[in-house]
């Protein structure tokens, strides 16, 4: 598909070797990494086989997407399961997705919403989202998902202008990395205090920890990770699941000001 300027998500870089232990610095130097679990292929296979509850429809969509050139843009099944659980835990009714691709993550979120829940999906690709629509119809969720084909920043700006501020419970950001900061700021206006903003690719296949990687996408993710770490407006955690999932919970503005 032809490139579009800062509108649709990009494929992740190839997996890079782990940064050498000798590069460890700061807080990491004080941690006994031998106590951390290494997720090798055997253990990951166990995780998928024994703990992932993936609906058959989602498994078929994942298999179809895997045959596509941009398959690496799809989230992993255990991440999809986590996102569905998070949506239920915060009792979300209205959700946002920035970057839809073939609709796998949207399915995970929409299936977790109540019957009267709504998911607004932002993407620019008719080709990719036509696959998504097909699976959404089969799942009986087409009326629960509002797909808006336009640059995500424009769609979010229109929602804000229309008075949807704090009108959403959950947002998932997985689109063009150079605009991640903009999407984050827009979602902070749209997601209610106590809601959740989930940001994909926060570890970017290890590139964020490699000083030799200074491309625009890596720099943007690095900068946003650091910004959110220091952002008093949210509670946050970066989870090493999938390609790194950063969770930010907007705080009540009154509590932040006090």
Model-predicted regions and their roles:
Residues 1-172, 177-198, 202-258:
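A short alpha-helical cap/connector motif
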């Amino acid at each position: 598909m032809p490139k579009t300027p800062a509108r649709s998500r990009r494929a992740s870089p190839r997996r890079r070797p782990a940064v050498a232990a000798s590069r460890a610095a700061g807080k990491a130097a004080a941690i006994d990494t031998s106590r951390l679990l290494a997720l090798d292929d055997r253990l990951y296979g166990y995780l998928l086989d024994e703990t992932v509850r993936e609906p058959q429809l989602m498994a078929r969509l994942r298999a179809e997407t895997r045959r596509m050139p941009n398959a690496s843009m799809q989230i992993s099944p255990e991440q999809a399961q986590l996102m569905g659980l998070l949506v239920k835990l915060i009792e979300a009714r209205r959700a946002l997705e920035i970057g839809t691709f073939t609709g796998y993550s949207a399915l995970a979120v929409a299936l977790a919403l109540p019957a009267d829940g709504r998911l607004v999906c932002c993407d620019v690709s008719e080709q990719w989202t036509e696959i998504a629509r097909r699976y959404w119809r089969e799942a009986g969720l087409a009326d629960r998902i509002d797909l808006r084909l336009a640059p995500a920043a424009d769609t979010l700006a229109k929602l804000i202008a229309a008075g949807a501020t704090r009108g959403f419970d959950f947002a998932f950001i997985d689109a063009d990395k150079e605009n991640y900061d903009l999407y984050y700021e827009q979602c902070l206006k749209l997601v209610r205090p106590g809601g959740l903003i989930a940001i994909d690719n926060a570890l970017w296949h290890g590139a964020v920890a490699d000083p030799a990687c200074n491309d625009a996408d890596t720099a943007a993710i690095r900068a946003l990770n650091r910004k959110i770490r220091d952002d008093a407006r949210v509670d946050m955690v970066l989870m090493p699941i999938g390609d790194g999932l950063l969770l930010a919970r907007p705080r009540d503005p009154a509590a932040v000001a006090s």
